């Protein structure tokens, strides 16, 4: 009798250890969302990839430990390779991490923690409120599903009540924080994801009876809700109208870039977008609001359009088909929380950039696997990822890039202090690791420009144009050509800068100085540029604009002598 009791306890301990190890194997890679790297430049995510590499190694260790436990206790080979609780582990990992993020945000709101951006009070572990809100919106349907799935309170046991309460508390915490983020994209994503979960949990028999009995009433309710949604949509638009118009203009230019690169642009989004916006404004057939809201974005704020532009429509269609297939499988297995999270993420991706952040990429892959196929292949996937990351050298590459980004902070201090010779030496050492970062390449090129190395400066600035659409790069290249007395090339580059962002006054000021050069003197063009510099209304007024205007007036007086 005592021996049987001991065996039962050992079996329970083994099962608990297996569940705990499985949970840790899933939660550790997803936990990269909470990793912050204040020692790096704001917005850098390479530290999260370094953490991910270590987390995957830890997950592999957990899975190996589970397999050894199951082997020791005589489990079948099929059971050893399967991961039957993968979906539950993903769901509860997201709930746990979502709760941590929600508490993090509340602490920031009340001033107990610093935010990730000086302009925003609420960012969680992210750099700004947009992605933070998107992450919370993705987790909310999972919380709702686990709150609803066990039915009424009185018919569930103590452990299920604990799950229900935990999911409910995290959901309430998220609802406390989400409105304060002011992210309309995340609000819409959260609502659609949660409505889908509620719809899938409906009592079909009861709904059919009520529909037949109160059909006219429900139709009138539907019409009322439709009008409320229209008013709400208009309110969301007028909450930040320039932001909404900016997204629309951004998508318009991205679509024009797609027409030029219908099978994808291998040079990336920034290069293709910069070209398309420059071509659009050069036609001089645009509305005033378009000039006002135009910018030099790093992302398309629409993952589908950006994927088509950079990888081509075939890859985009393939990913959509895979996602829809996983959603169908998840619905068949009644994993409505996981499916609701995927739907929320898909909606959020229409007007944001989640797939540029490690936390969303890893969560997206885990959610797809959690729809059903992860029960079979999750363990091989984790083991394969570990082999690829560690044997393939990715972790070493990420670590070297992180170290370079840390050194970049010091080099940047030299650059901003005007110690350009020392900055150039530091940038040269960092170039092999950071050669695909547009901001780094611009700083290096601008530092060389300030030091008088104009040809070398153009070499790095030309590379920066591939990774960054900022017209300031064109301005510095134009100034380099002017210093080298290649005036026609300088004019071409500065006009390209004007066309890329016509709302900026600085390139007109540079053109005015160029046309005042004795060897390239053109009084008519100078007067035109002078008029624009003096009369054009700046987007943001500053003392620099006043200085440019005074200098142009002084140049005009010199030319009159």
Question: Positions of the model-derived regions?
Answer:
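Short coil turns that delineate tetratricopeptide repeat
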Residues: 435-436, 468-469, 502, 538
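Register position in tetratricopeptide repeats
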Residues: 416, 450, 483-484, 517-518
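Hydrophobic alpha-helical transmembrane segments in integral membrane proteins
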Residues: 233-249, 387-417
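Interfacial juxtamembrane loops and adjacent helix segments
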Residues: 114-120, 256, 267-309
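Alpha-solenoid helical repeat scaffolds
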Residues: 408-409, 439-443, 472-476, 505-510, ...
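Alpha-helical transmembrane segments of multi-pass inner-membrane proteins
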Residues: 15-38, 52-73, 77, 84-118, ...
């Amino acid at each position: 009798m005592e021996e049987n009791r001991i065996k039962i306890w050992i079996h329970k301990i083994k099962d608990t250890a297996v569940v705990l190890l499985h949970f840790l194997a899933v939660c550790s890679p997803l936990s990269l969302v909470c990793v912050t790297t204040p020692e790096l430049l704001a917005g850098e995510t390479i530290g999260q990839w370094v953490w991910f590499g270590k987390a995957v190694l830890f997950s592999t260790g957990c899975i190996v430990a589970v397999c050894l436990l199951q082997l020791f206790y005589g489990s079948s080979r099929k059971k050893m390779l399967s991961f039957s609780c993968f979906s539950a582990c993903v769901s509860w990992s997201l709930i746990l991490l979502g709760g941590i993020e929600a508490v993090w945000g509340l602490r920031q709101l009340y001033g107990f923690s610093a935010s990730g951006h000086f302009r925003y009070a609420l960012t969680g572990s992210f750099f700004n409120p947009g992605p933070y809100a998107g992450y919370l919106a993705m987790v909310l349907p999972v919380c709702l599903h686990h709150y609803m799935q066990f039915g009424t309170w009185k018919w569930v046991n103590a452990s299920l009540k604990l799950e229900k309460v935990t999911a409910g508390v995290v959901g309430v915490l998220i609802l406390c924080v989400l409105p304060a983020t002011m992210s309309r994209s995340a609000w819409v994503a959260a609502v659609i994801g949660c409505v889908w979960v509620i719809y899938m949990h409906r009592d079909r028999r009861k709904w059919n009876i009520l529909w037949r009995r109160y059909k006219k009433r429900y139709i009138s309710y539907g019409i009322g809700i439709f009008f409320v949604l229209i008013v709400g949509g208009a309110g969301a638009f007028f909450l930040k109208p320039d932001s909404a118009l900016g997204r629309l203009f951004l998508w318009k230019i991205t679509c024009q870039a797609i027409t030029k690169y219908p099978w994808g642009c291998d040079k990336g989004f920034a290069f293709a977008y910069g070209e398309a916006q420059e071509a659009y404004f050069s036609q001089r057939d645009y509305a005033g609001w378009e000039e006002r809201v135009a910018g030099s974005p790093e992302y398309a704020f629409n993952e589908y359009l950006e994927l088509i532009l950079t990888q081509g429509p075939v890859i985009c269609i393939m990913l959509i088909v895979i996602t829809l297939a996983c959603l169908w499988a998840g619905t068949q297995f009644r994993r409505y929380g996981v499916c609701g999270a995927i739907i929320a993420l898909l909606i959020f991706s229409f007007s944001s950039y989640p797939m540029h952040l490690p936390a969303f990429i890893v969560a997206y892959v885990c959610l797809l696997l959690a729809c059903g196929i992860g029960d079979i292949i999750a363990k091989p996937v984790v083991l394969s990822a570990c082999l690829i990351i560690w044997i393939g050298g990715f972790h070493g590459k990420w670590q070297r890039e992180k170290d370079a980004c840390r050194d970049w902070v010091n080099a940047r201090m030299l650059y901003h202090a005007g110690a350009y010779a020392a900055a150039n030496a530091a940038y040269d050492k960092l170039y092999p690791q950071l050669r695909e970062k547009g901001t780094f390449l611009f700083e290096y090129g601008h530092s060389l420009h300030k030091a008088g190395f104009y040809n070398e400066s153009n070499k790095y600035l030309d590379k920066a144009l591939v990774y960054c659409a900022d017209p300031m790069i064109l301005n510095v290249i134009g100034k380099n050509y002017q210093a080298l007395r290649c005036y026609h090339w300088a004019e071409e580059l500065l006009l390209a800068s004007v066309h890329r962002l016509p709302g900026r006054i600085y390139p007109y000021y540079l053109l005015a100085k160029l046309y005042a050069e004795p060897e390239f003197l053109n009084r008519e063009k100078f007067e035109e540029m002078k008029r624009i510099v003096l009369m054009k209304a700046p987007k943001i007024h500053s003392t620099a604009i006043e200085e440019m205007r005074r200098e142009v007036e002084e140049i005009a007086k010199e030319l009159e002598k």
